[in-house]
UniProtKB/Swiss-Prot annotation:
One of its GO terms (cellular component) is cytoplasm. Keywords: Phosphoprotein. PANTHER family: PHOSPHATIDYLINOSITOL TRANSFER PROTEIN CSR1, PHOSPHATIDYLINOSITOL TRANSFER PROTEIN CSR1-RELATED. PROSITE patterns: CRAL_TRIO. It comes from Schizosaccharomyces pombe (strain 972 / ATCC 24843) (Fission yeast). GO terms for molecular function: phosphatidylinositol transfer activity. This is CRAL-TRIO domain-containing protein C3H8.02. The lineage of its organism: Eukaryota, Fungi, Dikarya, Ascomycota, Taphrinomycotina. Residues 171-330 form the CRAL-TRIO domain.
Amino acid sequence: MPEGAGRPWNLTELEEEKLKTMWSYLFKLFGITLLERTESWYTVKTHLSDDSSSSSSHRLSSVSYAKSRTRLELTSSSHGSDTRSFNDKTKNVHLERVEKIASEWDPEGLRVCFWDAVNCDDPDGLLLRFLRARKWNVEAALEMFMKTVHWRSREMNVGEIVCNADHLDKDDDFVRQLRIGKCFIFGEDKHNRPVCYIRARLHKVGDVSPESVERLTVWVMETARLILKPPIETATVVFDMTDFSMSNMDYGPLKFMIKCFEAHYPECLGECIVHKAPWLFQGVWSIIKSWLDPVVVSKVKFTRNYRDLQQYINPDNILKEFGGPNPWRYTYPEPCQNEAEALKNVEARKSLRAKKDAIAKQYEEVTMDWILNNGDMAEVKQKRRKLASQLIDAYWNLDKYIRARSVYDRMGLIAPQTSHTLLLSQPTNGDVKESMVEVTSSAT
């Protein structure tokens, strides 16, 4: 897929329809039926087939959602010019696995988990990551996304990780890894993507608990989301293999990281640079390569020296320890006194969550108009983009009440975006015309 394709600002008509379909399913899982939007019945235009593997197409239409069924049954009806279909063949779409995951929550609880997962992202942008990762197969993308919601809330408890971070006194291993700089984020690559460095030599098997390594991995990935500057959506990882030996090789954490990128943070990896790998790493790489998706393998680059690194990172962003001119060195600033006070302010947190949720509900309402083609579509899309920007603002207003300040806050690398440049895609005769819309943020 070309760079920038399949993003909120650059969708084909078919891709937009698949995004609408995914939203439609999510609404049903949230207990929101499209029929609540009006007293009439509507048919939603969609195309569910995975073009890369099947030529058959399917049609999705609105009906009430029955929890007792073992599938989402979607049947057609008509309402004037709103009735549309791609072909004459309709088919029920089996989503038993998705419904099984969703059954762990009541509909409103699932909706809350969804918006927590959106975090500071554009909601469309987040869903599109999963659609691209599953080659626009809506059913597969929805299952992947629901597994991620389960993983975030029931397995890893991501909210608790970011809420405590290096203030988590009981997890000394977590803080120890931050202090030594086992991994850190610094600078950008040539595509303006943030770069995360992992110093393999600083990891010793058994030195810290596997759980703390997993927590650190998730924390870094969540932190990178906050550092990304739209429209940049991916980050680059540099594995610094300087002085690497087999005592540093730990397959468990590596498998966990791969799982995170491939299953829960799809389309987040820009490039993976393996720097100064010794000859003994060849055997290790042959094993690791067999675990990776071919798309991920294509993103892995090997460098030996400063000259090689310059292919991917501009010289002014290459640190002295890699032969570059930049003198910056990682040091760990300890937590500041009283910097976690906002986390104790329950009333402020409740109030700001309520404000964010009110905007989310407005976004859902306008999204239903978009799905059903209600009103002037240019105006509806504009409203959605503005509300998406307001959701980002609302997240940043809430941020200090739900996320512990981190080393990157103390360094000044994490700060609310003061404005968001949004791209609205308008397909015309198969071509995408991009228009820039700047929305000023009110986040403080």
